[in-house]
């Protein structure tokens, strides 16, 4: 690259801003055609995708990247099938753009409502998994937003090959190639440029490790949709159904260990602890889950439960490790969650409506649940069709961010020569 990173990113930003204006007025049929054509292009380019991905995999192995990270890079036939299906599925989702809601007549005679509109240009910064390129591009395209995608340097060849397929789809639908752009430099300065271009970029969505997200949140000059941690809790209330508690707590921890909606801390009311914790501990031990508990938990379950430190209550393990605390009240459980949690997803197991209602009202998290596993905190499971990530912020979007979360609203007013008096 002969031009500077600043000049290159400025050029991408300018092109994205221009393309966003075209995409904002594109019809639903045009956007769906682009998505379907991109899916067909991916299907036809399997050999090219494999060749590009092999370059990334070889470089990753040579650099000593951890095997788990190498696995995340792989574009296996199943992963490519998933990307193709993802594009086609997004094409079937309802288009939120242009929808007008809440129209009402006011005493002055005017009609006022709200129209859903795109955000504009969205910058996506992510690591490792090249299939995120498809997830992000498809949702941004369907919601009428141009996007600039900056994937990890370890997936550069894969991301470029995927982007070429997307742009074939855009061309077939008569949309500008700049609707979806992949940053083609691996220079880390490109990230710094992308997050400090408010004249071209309206929102940043980072997907990656805590360090990446903290840096972007600190340095960005545009709004960021993010979550830092997934410290999720299940609280087994005094009025819990035992079978439900065991089933939910098992699933919330052991279905998968790495997702951000996996339970990391289990809270149990002291009055039910002797009935629920021993059978749960047996399940966890059989599945190789390391248990860390407070003094009451260790006294009940035995010395093989490690002593939980203060850091454990804040921990997102992403591993077969679980922290357990016995509490004396619903108040104590809510206080613990709001103090130590990450405001992601928390669940109560109870048969008391009043306790459930208090939990839903007082726990300050993006998703709060009753008698359900935290693993349900997902855009697909919520009926959103797909998600670009999960936000624990209170502005602009909160929880799983699907198509609607990538839009904004503007007021629309209809009159018939009305003037204000």
Swiss-Prot record:
Example GO BP: L-proline biosynthetic process
Signal peptide limits: none
Metabolic or biological pathway: Amino-acid biosynthesis; L-proline biosynthesis; L-glutamate 5-semialdehyde from L-glutamate: step 2/2
Pfam families cross-referenced by the UniProt entry: Aldedh (PF00171)
SUPFAM superfamilies for the chain: ALDH-like
Protein EC: 1.2.1.41
GO CC annotation terms, alphabetical: cytoplasm
Main location: cytoplasm
InterPro entries in UniProt: Ald_DH/histidinol_DH (IPR016161), Ald_DH_C (IPR016163), Ald_DH_N (IPR016162), Aldehyde_DH_dom (IPR015590), G-glutamylP_reductase_CS (IPR020593), Glu-5-SA_DH (IPR012134), GPR_dom (IPR000965)
Reactions mediated catalytically: L-glutamate 5-semialdehyde + phosphate + NADP(+) = L-glutamyl 5-phosphate + NADPH + H(+)
MF terms (GO), sorted A to Z: glutamate-5-semialdehyde dehydrogenase activity; NADP binding
Protein's UniProt keywords contain NADP: yes
Subcellular location: Cytoplasm
Keywords, sorted A to Z: Amino-acid biosynthesis, Cytoplasm, NADP, Oxidoreductase, Proline biosynthesis
PANTHER family: DELTA-1-PYRROLINE-5-CARBOXYLATE SYNTHASE (PTHR11063:SF8), GLUTAMATE SEMIALDEHYDE DEHYDROGENASE (PTHR11063)
Main function: Catalyzes the NADPH-dependent reduction of L-glutamate 5-phosphate into L-glutamate 5-semialdehyde and phosphate. The product spontaneously undergoes cyclization to form 1-pyrroline-5-carboxylate.
Family per record: Belongs to the gamma-glutamyl phosphate reductase family.
Protein name in the entry: Gamma-glutamyl phosphate reductase
Origin species: Ectopseudomonas mendocina (strain ymp) (Pseudomonas mendocina)
Taxonomic placement: Bacteria, Pseudomonadati, Pseudomonadota, Gammaproteobacteria, Pseudomonadales
């Amino acid at each position: 690259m002969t031009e500077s990173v600043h000049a290159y990113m400025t050029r991408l930003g300018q092109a994205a801003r221009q393309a966003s204006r075209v995409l904002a007025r594109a019809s639903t049929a045009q956007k769906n055609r682009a998505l379907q054509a991109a899916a067909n292009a991916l299907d036809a380019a399997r050999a090219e995708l494999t060749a590009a991905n092999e370059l990334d995999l070889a470089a990753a192995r040579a650099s000593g990247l951890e095997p788990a990270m190498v696995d995340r890079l792989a574009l296996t036939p199943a992963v490519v099938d998933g990307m193709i299906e993802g594009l086609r599925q997004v094409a079937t989702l309802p288009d939120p753009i242009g929808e007008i809601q809440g129209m009402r007549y006011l005493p002055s005679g005017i009609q006022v409502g709200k129209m859903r509109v795109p955000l504009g240009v969205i910058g996506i910064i992510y690591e490792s998994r090249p299939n995120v390129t498809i997830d992000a591009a498809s949702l941004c395209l369907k919601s009428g937003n141009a996007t600039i995608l900056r994937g990890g340097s370890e997936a550069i060849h894969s991301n470029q090959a995927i982007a070429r397929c997307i742009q074939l789809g855009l061309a077939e639908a008569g949309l500008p190639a700049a609707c979806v752009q992949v940053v083609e430099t691996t220079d880390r300065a490109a990230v710094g440029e992308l997050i400090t271009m408010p004249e071209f970029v309206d929102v940043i969505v980072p997907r990656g490790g805590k360090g990446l997200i903290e840096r972007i949140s600190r340095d960005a000059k545009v709004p960021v949709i993010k979550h830092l941690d997934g410290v999720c809790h299940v609280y087994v209330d005094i009025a819990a159904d035992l079978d439900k508690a065991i089933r939910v707590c098992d699933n919330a921890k052991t279905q998968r260990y790495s997702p951000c909606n996996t339970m990391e801390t289990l809270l149990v009311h002291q009055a039910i602890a002797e009935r629920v914790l021993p059978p749960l501990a047996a399940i966890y031990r059989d599945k190789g889950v390391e248990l860390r508990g407070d003094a009451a938990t260790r006294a009940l379950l035995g010395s093989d439960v490690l002593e939980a430190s203060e850091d454990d209550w804040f921990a997102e393990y992403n591993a077969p490790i679980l922290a357990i605390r016995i509490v004396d009240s619903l108040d104590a459980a809510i206080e613990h969650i709001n103090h130590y949690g990450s405001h992601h997803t928390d669940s109560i197991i109870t048969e008391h409506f009043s306790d459930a209602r208090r939990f839903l009202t007082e726990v300050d998290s993006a998703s709060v649940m009753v008698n359900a596993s935290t693993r349900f905190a997902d855009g697909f499971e919520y009926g959103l069709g797909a998600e670009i990530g999960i936000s624990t912020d209170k502005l602009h979007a909160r929880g799983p961010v699907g198509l609607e979360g990538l839009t904004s609203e503007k007021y629309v007013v209809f009159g018939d020569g009305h003037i204000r008096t």
